[in-house]
Amino acid sequence: MTQRPPLQSRYPIRLHRLDIGPHQLEIFAPADPDSLLDDPTVEARYKKDNYLPYWPVIWPSSLMLAEHILCSPDSPAATASKQTIVQPRALELGCGLGIAGIAAALCGWPVTFTDYDPEAIDFAAFNAGCNKIPSHLVETRHMDWRQPMDGKFDWIIASDVLYERRLHGILLDAIDQLLTPNGVVWISDQQRNSAADFPPVAVQRGFRVANSVLKWTGPSGVNSDADLLTLHRTNRSATLSGVTIT
């Protein structure tokens, strides 16, 4: 029996059943994401720091990232057992509904779900439970990139977080603080114009960047593409996602 969705009294909730790789995920989300724009709390936060609630939307790039996590033979989820990582940890930045993080947890990785919006974290945690992710693999944290949490992570994942150029440097500062020396970062993006400016900034900040293309065919047969950016510290040479970075 499916659990009662969180925050039922705030706004109507919709259940999405998503076929991703070998799994069908149950993802709860607000039925009308646009209605959150009229929320007085959101309006107040927008006046403070231009915040907008993008988290209730199921973005195609998050589905493509989740599928790549679950299905790619080069995914850290598939290769961690071949490496010398002791107690590997994954972090999802801007987790929204938690789709990519749930995919990593389905592969056995402990995942810390983080978002700027506390409601997003509630949904991500609830969705993880609905998909039978063991509680010991799930941690949730409210996090502002300007004030990263303590801790280091071997694998950082994110989708659709590059839509504002003004946040690129802040995001990279957070990644630099949170990533282990030999860690890897996967960021998927729906090929937005703003995302094209991110790799040069990342290189300036001491990262190597590889770009590959993810493809997705939705239930309606519509094809979508997304860029997968793989980041890696420059002080380590390695092969990531099938691409040798030099």
Residue ranges: model-predicted function:
Residues 1-246:
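S-adenosylmethionine-dependent methyltransferases
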